[in-house]
A protein has these predicted regions:
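Bacterial N-terminal signal peptides that target proteins for export
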Residues: 1-8
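Non-catalytic cap/lid and distal C-terminal segments of serine-dependent acyl enzymes
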Residues: 8, 20-309
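Hydrophobic core
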Residues: 12-20
């Protein structure tokens, strides 16, 4: 099938599904616009009732219906800054022959992809947990004829978000990959790191989860709530911060050194709980997209097996 015919098939599936999307998505999310990006890639603009606005999503559609879906979250800038899986890695080529839909939301800078308890002057209305676990999957399943089996992956800021969303999403995600993150929230280290990320975007951490270290922060502390990951397929990776052959772009050794220590401790926590996980500790890697691309390639077979890709 030619690329143009594949794109036409995707568009037809979207158009045909619009009448049923309202019933499948919760509550009332829908495709507000679409545009081809070449081959089976498209931009789908999805209206989020929770946030009261349209969210861009870059989508790599599988060649046929019935494929599972990988939700691929980017780092602190949310992808709107031109720094993302789409912009800085080979995702389009890598997934071209894979039986999976890949969805890359654009936005959510410095929000941790969570539901903020109050609107914020810096980040606006952030209800990303609701969007990613309740609104967007129904739209994607209806538009692309997806199987309903999902995995999620995050990197850097969104690594802990991916784990948190897997816990809080119940059966929504069968598998998760957390690459170079730090899944703490409610202890002094977690409070410092989470607050710093929110502040980078001009946000008030109190508008995110209330009083730092309080009840809502504890609800989102992945380390403390790790037991809820039982039964999920889990892939963890991080490096030492020492630049290596895979690194491309600006290396950030201190960030990766911290992520490496956090990830090692979290892998140990899962081991203590008897929860299986694949943990890759790289001797080199400095928090760059070259490293993250390598990690995603290694994570994929584990995610694929869990969702039937």
């Amino acid at each position: 099938m030619t690329a143009s015919r594949l794109w036409l098939a995707v568009v037809c599936a979207i158009v045909a599904s619009l009448g049923g999307v309202q019933a499948k998505a919760d509550p009332g999310a829908y495709v507000a616009g679409e545009a081809p990006l070449g081959g089976r890639a498209a931009q789908l603009d999805v209206y989020s009732p929770a946030m009261g606005r349209v969210i861009q999503n870059r989508v790599l559609a599988a060649a046929g219906a019935g494929a599972p879906t990988l939700y691929l979250l980017t780092g602190a800038g949310g992808g709107a800054d031109g720094i993302s899986w789409w912009d800085n890695t080979d995702v389009r080529d890598f997934f071209a022959d894979k039986h999976v839909n890949v969805v890359m939301p654009v936005g959510g800078a410095f929000t941790l992809y969570t539901d903020w308890i109050a609107d914020d002057p810096g980040v606006g209305r952030a209800r990303w947990e609701t969007y990613l676990t309740e609104e967007l999957p129904g739209v994607i399943d209806g538009a692309l004829g997806a199987s309903g089996r999902n995995a999620i992956a995050g990197v850097s800021m969104s690594a802990s978000s991916a784990l948190d969303l897997t816990i809080r999403g119940g059966s929504r995600f069968a598998a998760v990959a957390a690459l170079s993150g730090c899944p703490w929230a409610a202890d002094p280290l977690g409070i410092t790191m989470v607050s710093a990320q929110a502040a980078r975007g001009g946000g008030n951490p109190g508008n995110m989860w209330g009083v730092p270290g309080g009840a809502v922060w504890r609800e989102h502390d992945v380390f403390a709530n790790a037991g809820a990951l039982a039964g999920k397929t889990i892939f963890l990776s991080a490096a030492t911060g020492l630049p290596g052959a895979a690194d491309r772009g600006l290396p950030m050794p201190p960030l990766e050194t911290i992520a490496g220590a956090c990830t090692a401790a979290f892998a140990g926590r899962l081991g203590q709980l008897g929860i299986p996980a694949t943990y890759v500790h790289r001797p080199t890697g400095a928090h760059t997209w070259g490293q993250f691309q390598t990690d995603l390639h290694e994570a994929w077979p584990h995610l694929a097996a869990a969702i039937g890709a």
